[in-house]
């Protein structure tokens, strides 16, 4: 009887551990992106989403970032305007990812994808 109780306790513990480890944090949620301005000038961004919408984020100060915003998954075009010059970056956004679109001091753009799971 004792071995049966131990087995049942072990089985329940194993089942609980397995269920917790297999839980995904993200349930096919839309991607989210933000602009990080590590440059020396204010930056404004126009975002053309994969579903045809256009979003503007204006005057992101140097040393700051915008908040994350959700977009439809797919190819998204970011046009950054710094001192009247346009810089473009096209990014394939996937569900369950955050994206950091960063501008460096030379106005180079880098993209980092962060898995939400």
Please report, for each region that a protein language model flagged, where it lies by residue:
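Short, ordered, surface-exposed loop/turn motifs in non-cytosolic proteins
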Residues: 40-51
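Short Pro-Gly-centered beta-turn/loop motif in secreted/extracellular proteins
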Residues: 66-77
């Amino acid at each position: 009887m004792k071995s049966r109780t131990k087995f049942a306790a072990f089985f329940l513990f194993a089942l609980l551990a397995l269920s917790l480890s297999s839980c995904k944090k993200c349930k096919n949620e839309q991607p989210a992106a933000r602009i990080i301005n590590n440059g020396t000038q204010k930056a404004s961004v126009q975002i053309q989403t994969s579903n045809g919408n256009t979003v503007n984020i204006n005057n992101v100060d140097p040393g700051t970032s915008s908040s994350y915003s959700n977009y439809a998954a797919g190819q998204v075009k970011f046009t950054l305007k710094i001192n009247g010059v346009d810089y473009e970056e096209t990014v394939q956004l996937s569900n369950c990812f955050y994206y950091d679109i960063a501008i460096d001091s030379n106005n180079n753009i880098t993209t980092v994808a962060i898995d939400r799971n």
